[in-house]
Amino acid sequence: MMKRKFIFLLFALCAMIVSAQNTKYVNMFMGSSGDNGQLAPGATVPFGVICVCPDSDPNTHAGYNYETTKVTGISINRLSGVGCSGGGGNIRIRPLHPSKELHINKKTERAVPGYYATAFTNGIQTKLTATNQMAVEKYLYPKEIPAALWIDFSSCFEADATYEYSQAAPTILEGFIHAKTVCGRGMYKLYFSLNTDKPFKLKEIDGEQPCLDFGNDVRKVEVRIAVSALSTDVARKECARWNKYSFNRLKKNSYKEWKELLATVDVKGGTDDDKAIFYTSLYRACLSPVDVTSADGRYLGTDGKVYRADGFRYYSNWSLWDTFRTKFPLLILLKPGQMRDIATSLLHLYRTGKKDWATLDESTPTVRTEHAVILLLDAYRKGITDLDFNIGYAGMKEEMERLLMRKPDQKMEAACDLWAMAQISEIMGKKEDAILYKERAERLFEETWKKEFMNIDASYEIMKGNGLYQGTRWQYRWAAPQFLDKMIEWVGKDTLCAQLSYFFDNHLYNQGNEPDIHVPYIFNRLGAPEKTQQLVRNLMTEPMIHKYGGNAEFKKPYFGKAFKNHPIGYSPEMDEDDGTMSAWYAFGALGFYPMLVGDEHYELTSPLFDKIVLRLENGNKLTIQTVDRVQKDMPIRSVTFNGSKVENFRISHNELIKGGKLIFNY
């Protein structure tokens, strides 16, 4: 018996050691160069409000640009891989007078999950870490440079913020900033408490940024900036919570959070680059939404009122037009407890006031909230059944009446929302509503698809043709997999499969934007699973021809990989979009994908790795394994789950989370 216990403990210890190594694969600089992802290597915790990082000059949407050494300073927040001018970039600190240039010494730059450090070419060093709502910044000065910090309270990636501040103590500044969200579609207000470990003299000169002067004898300064959407008092208390924790302790805590999160998935096989892209993708998928709940359990509603979060944590910072497709399905799989809180937050968002983009009373920078009903249905279908839809049902109904339907793509997306709303109504026992929304969805799809997308002609290849948003008619043709059976009925299965083959053979697919990223998996449903397997593998690992960027057709097609373990981590103009593209890659690597969000089934494809182990939150373990695969592009012969054959290359989420072995035979 003792021998058995020893062996068990030994295996458990080995598993912990292997999992602890997963963080080493995260490439914090992947996708941080130019317009190839729009990402940053900032210090943050999972789903943290703070992401503290240098801002490049000129900057990108996330503030940081790997290929640029010149920086304007270090700001406390940013969104990951989003469009327009990005979001955040607030409370920017500069450890050198603004009249003098500040350049990163690239040889000294280092970043791991939860920590960033670099030296500047003038000898000043900075080290950065974070808690959920507090940036921690350490500055080390050479003897010849006096310790001083210049603060730009107006800094914001979207437009200058308005602000107020005052000195509350010899080591404390407090106030607020009021800034625009992404694309200028809304506003957020952050109260802050800025604390230093040494007293400073506040210098305020007209036309210049306020300066914190620490005197000639100080060589090290630590700054802590806590924020809250509620009040300076809450921000002050948030800062005080961590008084007993040193910089190194906070750094270790942040790293530990990431280590534990990434330990939920272990892989064997594949190349080091495969592992780096995979674990970096898991990391990127867990940056948002962010937990804005105060320590005493309160949050700011989008109606400007303060509420108590009873029995859940309140999340903000949305980019749902992108992320409902992949990121949230991934979180439902890996973090269902957290997804319950995220879904509950969305229901309360409907209650307090939800716009398609943002309100004037946001808690953080945010982007878009369309298709929340599909996300909520997906969570419910995949086992998060203790959601109180009554909280947001009135708001959902109101949203269904104002869905945009001016353009063909809007009509296709509206049909998908109505489809989801019909099912939520059915779940709630509202039969009449369910029938109404189902009929509206089916009628709208039929009218739109038959008129705009059924009869193919040369205009289908034109980006933004017929007013489409960031896509072509070819790409939006497949945008509503909810109605795939109707497409098959109207066109014929063989014809539709041939048209889909033409779509890919002629490079009309766009991996660089969201409307068609599910389309490789449609081959599964058309009886050609080997094409899904080949396409997904090639898109993940091989150089391919890419004709389209985010908003236009390239003058010359780009030939290369869409995903690379490199600062130029994505194809040109491919925004990572707040975890969307990362989650797309992660699902492909796992060997299954949520082609139809709102349905519990996954489409199977060939896993990237030879063996994958998922430690599910319910305590079960799912092992995914390949058998007799001697070449990476071999087609799958059959799939079994716990010994039973899986039919049609589809499997349900609710079966997978029971745990067991998913075996791919070649």
Regions found by a protein language model. Name each.
Residues M1-Q21:
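Bacterial Sec-dependent N-terminal signal peptides
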Residues P607-F609, Q631-P635:
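Short coil-to-beta strand junction motifs in C2/discoidin
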Residues Q21-F328, I332-I374, R381-L404, P408-M412, ...:
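Accessory carbohydrate-recognition regions in carbohydrate-active enzymes
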Residues E413-D417:
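Hydrophobic, small-residue-rich alpha-helical packing segments that form membrane-like cores
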Residues T448-D457, I462-K464:
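Long, well-ordered, tryptophan-enriched scaffold segments
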